[in-house]
Swiss-Prot record:
Pfam families in UniProt: PTR2
Transmembrane segments: 14-34, 49-69, 91-111, 138-158, 167-187, 212-232, 235-255, 267-287, 312-332, 344-364, 379-399, 413-433, 458-478
Family as reported in the entry's similarity comment: Belongs to the major facilitator superfamily. Proton-dependent oligopeptide transporter (POT/PTR) (TC 2.A.17) family. DtpD subfamily.
Entries under PANTHER family matching the protein: PROTON-DEPENDENT OLIGOPEPTIDE FAMILY TRANSPORT PROTEIN (PTHR23517:SF15), RESISTANCE PROTEIN MDTM, PUTATIVE-RELATED-RELATED (PTHR23517)
Organism: Salmonella paratyphi C (strain RKS4594)
UniProt GO MF annotations: dipeptide transmembrane transporter activity; peptide:proton symporter activity
Official protein name in the record: Dipeptide permease D
PROSITE patterns reported in the protein's UniProt record: MFS (PS50850), PTR2_1 (PS01022), PTR2_2 (PS01023)
GO CC, any one term: plasma membrane
Classification via SUPFAM superfamilies: MFS general substrate transporter (SSF103473)
Topology class, membrane: Multi-pass membrane protein
Main localization category: membrane
């Protein structure tokens, strides 16, 4: 085997942890909107609001998580601490079936754990490569695709356990998965000795009467309580506004920190990619909310007398990501010629185009439901699979570019900002979009027809919105291609 072409051994432990984190996070996510509407009897508006608030805040905390990793914890310790908190949160969520007051607290604990984990797992992977290592893109595609093994199995396993036993057991299974991933990761600890560890000097330094480790403990207790209040009072939108304002200030600081035109150009590319990623995910995140309730209410899920649990459909998207991601990871080493910026915009155009095609298929499904009362399952599966394939041309490309930037000490923060816009703001926008399909009652036939037509309208609008984004990205791609060819001709002459 060519050792230069093979991936670092440490990547397999990172991938294993990612698999189980996906299992934990997406197993719970597949159940959450259904739990709120079917078990806790929230109306659609309330369920969408809480679901989008949760999905938004899990992407706000990576900014703080990235900062703590860069300055104090290091990526490895931040990832381990985040995994532990997420497992605790899922266990508490299971108890909310008995005591609903635990609902907000459990979601808050998961949000804090996710903040420490999500941005720093990618940065930890980035530490395994040199900046221009040709294996880097393949490693990120492998991480993204292999992680989806967990998100394929999770909706099936958690959905089945919930259906056969209870909601609490479904959430507990998600917690067990996260703990299993943490144990596996700890077994490979010796392969990460060259990565950044805990900054003991900063951790032990005193600030305002207490050492920093004391302030860190206070933060770990206070943050979940504060986020619980945000859920309870429905103040999450204000948190997003504050986080966005802080991020703009941080971006301006990083821009001033850039010392060369090349660094400023790289930062500008990352910001532009982030904005298009935000729009992409505002569309894609319908999968856990409006699409999930659409499947639950208007898709014929019967196979030979067995009704497929709605949560299991979340596996379709993940299966498409994994299958196509493995192929892309193999092909990427054959596609390293030409200008990198041109390739990036070409991939983004393809990803947004596939998202538009996926929602076009869902629009056909919704029209079928409007005509016949229920849509066919194969059409739904096809649409979800196309949307899953689209993901491979967005996040791995953007994350790889962020970890490549040549400005010291900013990758964690930039990753957190990327998560804020493409995750938090995108999920808030996704909630606004999903709310257009809300219906509190489906008893009268008129209400049912109205609900189906609402899904038709929303899915069709997303189709055209994604297509418009493709047009803009293609213009950028053509401009970059022309500029690259002009420079090549100038060099030859």
């Amino acid at each position: 085997m060519n050792k230069q072409a093979s991936q670092p051994r440490a990547i397999y432990y990172v991938v294993a942890l990612q698999i189980w984190e996906y299992f934990s996070f997406y197993g719970m996510r597949a159940l959450l909107i259904l739990y709120l509407t079917n078990q806790l009897k929230y109306d659609d508006n309330h369920a969408y609001e809480l679901f989008s608030a949760y999905c938004s805040l899990v992407y706000v905390t990576p900014i703080l998580g990235g900062y703590l990793a860069d300055k104090v914890l290091g990526n490895r310790m931040a990832v381990m601490l985040g995994a532990f908190l997420m497992a605790i949160g899922h266990l508490v969520l299971g108890a909310s079936e008995i005591a609903p007051t635990f609902l907000y607290l459990s979601l808050a604990i998961i949000v804090c754990g996710y903040g420490l984990f999500k941005s720093n797992i990618s940065c930890l992977l980035g530490e395994l490569y040199q900046p221009e290592d040709p294996r880097r893109d393949g490693g990120f595609s492998l991480l993204y695709a292999a992680g989806n093994i967990g998100s394929i199995v999770a909706p099936i396993a958690c959905g089945y356990v919930q259906e056969e036993y209870s909601w609490a057991m479904g959430f507990a299974l998600a917690a067990i998965g996260m703990l299993a991933g943490l144990v596996i990761f700890l077994c490979g600890n010796r392969h990460f000795t060259h990565t950044t560890g805990v900054n003991k000097a900063v951790l032990c330094a005193r600030n305002y009467l207490l050492p920093n480790w004391g302030w860190l403990l206070i933060l770990l207790v206070a943050a979940p309580l504060l986020i619980t209040v945000l859920f309870w009072k429905e103040w999450s939108v204000y948190a997003l506004i504050v986080a966005t304002a802080i991020s703009l200030v941080v971006l301006a600081k990083i821009y001033r920190q850039a010392q060369t035109a090349k660094q400023r150009k790289e930062l500008g590319l990352i910001v532009t990619l982030t904005l298009f990623s935000m729009l992409f995910w505002a569309f894609a995140q319908q999968g856990g909310s409006s699409i999930s309730l659409y499947i639950d209410r208007f898709v014929n899920r019967d196979i030979l007398g067995y009704s497929v649990p709605t949560a299991m459909f979340q596996s379709v998207n993940a299966f498409a990501v994994m299958l196509c991601g493995v192929v892309l990871a193999w092909l990427v080493k054959e596609s390293v010629s030409g200008n990198r910026t041109v390739r990036i915009w070409g991939k983004f155009a393809l990803g947004l185009g596939l998202m538009s095609a996926g929602f076009c298929i869902l629009t056909l499904s919704a029209r079928w439901s409007a005509a016949y009362g229920h849509s066919s399952m194969p059409l739904m599966v096809l649409g979800l699979a196309v949307m899953g394939f689209a993901e491979l041309f967005i996040d791995p490309v953007a994350m790889s570019q962020i970890t490549r930037i040549d400005i010291p000490g900013v990758t964690g923060v930039l990753t957190g900002i990327y998560m804020l816009l493409s995750g938090a703001i995108a999920n808030y926008l996704a909630g606004v979009i999903a709310d257009q399909t809300s219906q509190s009652a489906f008893d009268a036939s008129g209400a049912v027809n109205y609900a189906i037509n609402a899904y038709v309208d929303v899915f069709e609008q997303i189709t055209w919105g994604a297509l418009a984004c493709v047009g803009v990205v293609l213009l950028i791609w053509l401009y970059q291609s022309f500029k690259f060819k002009s420079r090549a001709l100038a060099v030859e002459s």
